[in-house]
Amino acid sequence: MNNESICILLLLFVKITSYYSYYISPLKKNIYTRTIYKGHILKLKNDKPEIDNNIINYFKNIRSDYPFFQQNNSPIYFDNAATTHKPKSVIEKIKNFYYYNNSNIHRGIYKISRNATDNYEHVRNIVQKYINCDSSDEIIFTSGATYGINMVCNIIMDKIIKNENDEIYISYLEHNSNIIPWQENIRNKKKGKLKYIPLKKNGYINIKKFVEKINDNTKIVSINHVSNVLGNIQNINLIIKKIKKKNPNIIVIIDAAQSFPHLKYDIKKMKLKNEDPDILVTSGHKFCAPFGSGFVYIKKKLTHTSKTNPFLYGSNIITDVNKYRSKFVSSPYIFETGTQNISAILAMGEAIKYLQKINDEGNAYKYEMYLYDLFLFYLRSFLTNHLVELPYIPEPNTPIKPDKMRTTMQVRNSKVDDKYFHSEIQNQDNDYLKIFVHNTRKDNKKKIAILPLWSLNFTSFDLVTFLDFKNICIRSGHHCASLLHNNFFNINESSRISIMFYNTPEEVQYLAEQISATTHMLHSMRRNGKAV
């Protein structure tokens, strides 16, 4: 290591140490307690978001349901799209199973085994009632969305995809778990072809263009209801209705991993308007259930009308085993091979009951979006014109002023190619404090409280590392959505903020403050001649 490298490392160490001493040490005495941080006093503008104080107090009070938030120095947690925290009732369900009813299911005839089996099957009924589907036999328990999509992909490729011209549509917005299984099955089984759904510049599916592409060869459409990066809520009711109108034989799969914690499904109601999905995939740990839990809703017509093979082979799925051939049970049990994660499934039932209680108030989504709007309000207050809110797409024939071009992404509809985030926009000036966010909320589009942000002058790793010093948890990287970053944003990675109903107004203010402070600190380090 040469002298220059040593000097750079020493300078970086001194700056980080100074930053820690100046910003963090004093905060430990004041913030990292169970007393909610109050934030600095701001001169607030008239457009500050507001909501009924009774709603705020209700959701502040439910934090007492979560042991995670009762610990000293509880982290300020905004990575809820990665996983959610678990209420005490969910944790107690796991503990009670192992304390008092630990036994296997669908096997023993003794009392605690029968009880375990009954309780396990009762969760199937809880799920069926919560999403209001026709039968509990349409509910298959899984370890999560990744397993669920792989299982569904395997079933579909065997039953539906017959030749190399059969089309499977996904989008650039998908989680890798809804991309790679299709790629690998097509490659290994040498049938089917993968196609991509047209998108608008704001990250919503271009329904008109998509429906025009559908033909008799289109067999599968597999899309997320909500992007785990953008938070956009796709209009799946309209999408499904138009797909089925053009080709009723198409199987529509909805990845509900990000939507299920925030939005309510009513399958029977959707079915009345021909807007219901054929398959719905969820992940338990995203909606306050334990890791290793989830479920897939599959219409009976896909599993009961013709022979269906198991995804995995083994115990608990057979009716008869002969020397060279075996006979299998029907759905849903044919897809629940081996010993299941019983305690996690029981606790998932408890989590759904908890969600039902929260949703009965009718304000969870409203409150989350209030926090989202409040966060952006504070971020605008701190960063002022350094905050760039994308997408900005003017109406056709609207003149673009050069000064406005420097603070917003302004692209005429006729001049935008397949890349969303253009290099000429990225490099338009030398504003090293500039932070980009993707916020379709400002255009009155439907979304959940997820916000990606990034800078061209430091990495998401830099931002998230320094926020971690402040006891703040947000996500960095590509968030398992590689195509979205590479083919839609045209950037390598981003930071992601995701809000849940147990977050507070004080937390979102503190988060905005610290993002601004960290941005200025990183800019200062860069300005002194050393790249971060």
UniProtKB/Swiss-Prot annotation:
UniProt pathway annotation: Cofactor biosynthesis; iron-sulfur cluster biosynthesis
Subcellular location(s) per record: Plastid, Apicoplast
Keyword Transferase: yes
Sorted UniProt keywords: Apicoplast, Plastid, Pyridoxal phosphate, Signal, Transferase
EC number: 2.8.1.7
Annotated SUPFAM superfamilies: PLP-dependent transferases
Disruption phenotype: Essential for blood-stage parasite survival. Conditional knockout in the mosquito stages does not affect the number of oocysts and development of midgut- and salivary gland-associated sporozoites up to day 14 post-infection. On day 22 post-infection, fewer oocysts show sporulation and the number of salivary gland sporozoites is reduced.
InterPro entries from the UniProt entry: Aminotrans_V_dom, PyrdxlP-dep_Trfase, PyrdxlP-dep_Trfase_major, PyrdxlP-dep_Trfase_small
Assembly and interaction partners: Monomer. Interacts with SufE; interaction enhances cysteine desulfurase activity of SufS.
Enzyme active site: 480 (cysteine persulfide intermediate)
Segment forming the signal sequence: 1-18
Keyword Phosphoprotein listed: no
Function field: Catalyzes sulfur activation and mobilization in sulfur mobilization (SUF) pathway for iron-sulfur (Fe-S) cluster biogenesis. Active when in complex with a partner protein SufE. Required for apicoplast maintenance. Plays a role in the development of sporozoites in oocysts in mosquitoes.
Swiss-Prot/TrEMBL catalytic activity: (sulfur carrier)-H + L-cysteine = (sulfur carrier)-SH + L-alanine
The protein's name: Putative cysteine desulfurase PbSufS
Residues recorded as bearing N6-(pyridoxal phosphate)lysine in the entry: 286
Pfam family, one: Aminotran_5
Major location (coarse): plastid
GO-annotated cellular components: apicoplast
GO MF annotation terms: transferase activity
Similarity comment: Belongs to the class-V pyridoxal-phosphate-dependent aminotransferase family. Csd subfamily.
